[in-house]
Amino acid sequence: MKKYTLFFTFCLLISVFGAYSQDSKAGAIIDAMQKKYKTMKSFGASFTYGVDGSSQVLQGNITVKGSKYRLKTGGQEIFNNGKEVATYIKETNEVNISDYEPSENDLNPAKVYTFDKKGFRYVFVQEVTEGGESYEVIELSPEKKGTQVSKVKIKLNKKDKSVKSWVITDKNGKRQTFKVNKFTPNVAVDDKYFAFDKSKYPGVEVNDLR
């Protein structure tokens, strides 16, 4: 069974982090960002991502509504209807279904924008100007030893605290960069959109892991 790990890499932005003396400016930026996104009932985003050393740039999109989400990227679709998670792999036309078990450390893509900052070591890095817009850059790193992530650097619009991009550096120094191309708040979406519908994938092989 071929495994894909992009979803987990994408969501490692909200892995378990430890507590250190914190940068108050970075903390205030995080608070403002979270206040913005937590007021939304739902949202949709399209993004590009790539790995340092590779010229390949891939595209993806995500729709989130509460704990429900649907992520399309890297030849796969991930559905979470709040009860179960279905990962569809296009190349092999198979879907893996497992129970959704939320926890404090759940790698829910909704938390890319609303992660709990408790336990994070966060610092303000710099302010930069791109295309006439001012952006604030903050960096988060884990206290817990042995995690796959070394640090996460997030770039936010200074004016409205929207996330522009983030860079994940793993323990081996490899970096993945994600850039938000379009963000739509409060999208109208039915709950059925987050459930895998077998009838729409003729001949799909179902691997029930529950």
What function would you assign to each model-found segment?
Residues 17-55, 67-68, 200, 205-210:
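N-terminal leader/targeting segments and the immediate start of mature chains
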Residues 120-202, 206-209:
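Gly/Pro-enriched, hydrophobic low-complexity segments
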Residues 100-134:
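Flexible, surface-exposed loop/linker segments and immediately adjacent secondary-structure boundaries
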